[in-house]
Amino acid sequence: VVRYDYKGIEGLQLSANYNFGQRHNDKGRALTPGLKNAFGFGALYTAGDLDARFAYGHTNLETNATYKHRVDGFLASLGYKFGDFKLTGDFGYAHVKFDDAKTNKFYVSPGFAYQVTPASQVYGNYLYERVKGEADKDKTHGFLLGADYKLHKQVVLFVEGKYVTT
């Protein structure tokens, strides 16, 4: 991987990367399918209580045939903090092409976090996801609610519950 980060403007970070081919994971096991190459770029902007992020990625996967297998996707996230209460919104889209088959994926996930004490917070979000292939269309709705407690700067206990329907 080759990566470049630009941090010349206060509150703004721009990043770009190129991933070379990879046929094995970190433990030496074969990846199926292998990574032919990939690139991505993103931007993070923070000003006061506002946090905005955007990323785009393109991945070419290896095939042993003449057709292509690729994945394109983007992610956008926006968050704003009102004292101890934070609202967030995540949005994503992916397009997968495998030979002549195409699949489009979309999700939106608004959420919140409330800092109850300096060591504890409650958080939750809603998820709507749609996956549309050549012949099928699936929708998912989900809710997540959780709480955490920070015992130490590197130790956090948490409990979460979720409900998902398709």
Model-derived regions: residue spans:
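Outer-membrane beta-barrel biogenesis signature
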Residues: V1, L151-F158, T166
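Surface-exposed coil loops of outer-membrane beta-barrel proteins
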Residues: V1-F39
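Detector for outer-membrane/organellar transmembrane beta-barrel domains
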Residues: P33-L144, Y149-K150, K162-Y163
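Short loop/turn motifs that connect adjacent beta-strands in outer-membrane beta-barrel proteins
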Residues: E10-G11, A119, Q154
